[in-house]
């Protein structure tokens, strides 16, 4: 949710922490092909599958919807060791059961060409850079955006409101939507940080920036 990319050192540290435990890992890797500022995407996305101590206990989750711009299709996958997959299916069959057949055939055919997902880093980095350049002209403080299609900002310099209240005000008064990062904390921890999504047409981003520069 924070547009942070875990490094190899981070993953090794997690592996060390989990090693003496029986904890299972849910590794959400739906943005695996959206990593910025690197020579190649593969050099920076560190999947749990690459670390034996993590792979043995991990449910690795990814999304065809986010990779291929078809989020409305609600199609993804989970990779896990055979013993864990058996248990996963017992639960999953009652939640979803299956994905419709035409969508599965369509994705299988589309995946034959790797170019669409290999082009994602450059595609989204250009949008990120466009959005960040415009935000530099506001009083919002930019936080790093290393991957995904999200940009987090600190609102302390522009408002005393709590994150959720600020997001509601921003939508109502300026017509720009943001997400309060406190929504991702069980206790609603508020750091005065909100998140924008830049997976939009350039004209939409430029319109939003024009409004945000009034803050």
What is the predicted role of each segment?
Residues 1-215:
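PLP-dependent class I/II
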């Amino acid at each position: 949710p924070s547009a942070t990319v875990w490094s190899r050192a981070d993953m090794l540290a997690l592996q060390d922490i989990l090693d003496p435990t029986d904890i299972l890992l849910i590794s959400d890797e739906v943005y695996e092909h959206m990593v910025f500022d690197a020579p190649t995407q593969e050099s920076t996305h560190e999947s749990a599958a690459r670390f034996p101590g993590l792979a043995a206990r991990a449910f690795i989750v990814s999304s065809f919807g986010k990779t291929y711009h078809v989020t409305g299709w609600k199609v993804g996958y989970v990779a896990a060791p055979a013993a864990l997959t058996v248990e996963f299916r017992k639960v999953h069959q009652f939640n979803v059961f299956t994905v419709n057949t035409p969508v599965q055939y369509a994705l299988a055919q589309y995946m034959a060409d790797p170019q669409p997902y290999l082009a994602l880093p450059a595609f989204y980095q250009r949008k990120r850079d466009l959005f960040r350049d415009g935000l530099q002209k506001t009083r919002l403080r930019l936080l790093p955006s290393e991957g995904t299609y999200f940009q987090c900002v600190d609102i302390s310099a522009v408002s005393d409101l709590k994150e959720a209240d600020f997001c509601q005000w921003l939508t109502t008064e300026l017509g720009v939507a943001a997400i309060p990062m406190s929504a991702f904390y069980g206790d609603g921890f508020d750091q005065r940080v909100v998140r924008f999504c830049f997976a939009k047409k350039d004209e939409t981003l430029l319109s939003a920036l024009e409004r945000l520069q009034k803050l």
